[in-house]
Amino acid sequence: MSFELPALPYAKEALEPHISAETLEYHYGKHHQTYVTNLNNLITGTAFEGKSLEEIVRSAEGGIFNNAAQVWNHTFYWHCLAPQAGGEPDGALADAINAAFGSFAEFKTRFTDAAIKNFGSGWTWLVKNPDGTLAIVSTSNADTPLTSPAKPLLTVDVWEHAYYIDYRNARPQYLEHFWALVNWNFVAKNFAA
């Protein structure tokens, strides 16, 4: 089984003015596609051929892991975003955020701070621990919570290719705009699952 680039859940220009169509053209159309292509090339003729993406991420190492995890991470990230989104979550997710961080504002501050301080390339995540509590986790490079007991709920890509076209080296500015796009419906579904 070979993997294909999953369709975006919106048009490339739908996230403007926060994330440009040009960024999506490169980030999704080039970077994400390259991870898919590399993964297919690397798994051909191996024990990973025919396995699900999640199975590969949880059991592979080296180049196969890096490319599989980046395919999964990016696909998850695209679903964490939506046009005309943002705002704040409600219901059980809002209650869990308040229990873990004191308030939504405090969560947003801590998540943003973790993403800004995530050195180099990587991802910052909101995860649900096996005991139901929430935590903010930063991972480097292709690392992902899929390899841990925690369940990913939300992520932001802090590799420079995620924001360099629109914001150059100003990661904090990118993160400020990220909050206007967070798809809380997707995050809430992950939390409830």
Language model features with spans:
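Feature for soluble, non-membrane regions of globular proteins
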Residues: 1-193
